[in-house]
Amino acid sequence: MKVLGLETSCDETGLAIFDSEQINSENKGLLGQVLYSQIELHALYGGVVPELASRDHIRKLVPLFNELLAQCNISKDEIDAIAYTKGPGLIGALMTGALFGRSLAYGLDIPAIGIHHMEGHLLAPLMGLNPPAFPFVSLLVSGGHTLLIAAHGIGQYEILGESIDDAAGECFDKAAKMLGLPYPGGPNIAKLAENGNPNAYSLPRPMLHRGLDFSFSGMKTAVHNLIKDTDGSGNGSDSDPQVRADIAASFQHAVVDTLVKKCVKALKQVDMSRLVIAGGVSANSHLRETLERELAKINATVHYAPPALCTDNGAMIAYAGYERLQAGQSDDLAVSCVPRWPMTELPAV
């Protein structure tokens, strides 16, 4: 089964084709993928502008689709099914992918299915060289979500903890903006932190010892106050370069410390030994190194998506779609998107 995956939930236009007949090959069934990022467009505004995101998806979907077909050396008539991101995300952005996918499926007379964006991230590590077996605990950490989930199977998800305010990735973006760094914040803070001392400043770890939920808004406020205290203006771009690097390193260390300790606590609470980490923030090298070190102490293993599948992409949607389509699930012709969609509402496979 060749499944076309479409991802348009935010500011990346991602398309990919997954072929189940090649799942045991080196590429794990991924025939090809194309990705267009709107980072440069939104960097001018310091964050994603929903209307601009939607327009850019519309502009890029058809050219990217044609590029993907050429890359995979197939025709559109060889596609057996289509999976598109149904939610959560920006409603306008979601609608562009959903309408393109549903219309193409109708024209080709093939099934289509809407996929939960975060389920795509959760299942992406299954396309890696060392795929985890169920059950496992998953940390889904991105610009819009921070979730700890006990995954007992596809569609069998138990929410263990989540952010009660800002997501970790969102906190990275806002801290970066305060430090005068461009969007997206995560990679730029990580780069600046390489030259900083992670122990230079003590930042709070909100809710660290209160269950498995997260809170990052207090950490964001602490960074703002720290910048104001160190340079007097509150404008991080005017700070001494070493001070900025130390603040970035201390902030990153505080976020990572919080995430790692919650993961360890979650594994112990549900008596599991496998952790899957996915989402854009999962690419952070300091987070990966700290997780591997701390999980080794409790004889637990950590699994990641392949590097190209950490951020938003069409491959994870194609694979999640394949798993659900082969179980007999599909959607009717009505196009509907869900900007807010709890993972616990998903049907089991």
UniProtKB/Swiss-Prot annotation:
The record's subcellular locations are: Cytoplasm
Q: Which residues bind Fe cation?
A: 117, 121, 312
Q: Which GO terms describe its molecular function?
A: iron ion binding; N(6)-L-threonylcarbamoyladenine synthase activity
Keywords assigned:
Acyltransferase, Cytoplasm, Iron, Metal-binding, Transferase, tRNA processing
Top enzyme class, one word, equals transferase
Regarding protein family, the annotation reads: Belongs to the KAE1 / TsaD family.
- Family annotation (NCBIfam families): gcp_kae1, T6A_TsaD_YgjD
Q: What is this protein called?
A: tRNA N6-adenosine threonylcarbamoyltransferase
Q: What is the lineage of its organism?
A: Bacteria, Pseudomonadati, Pseudomonadota, Gammaproteobacteria, Moraxellales
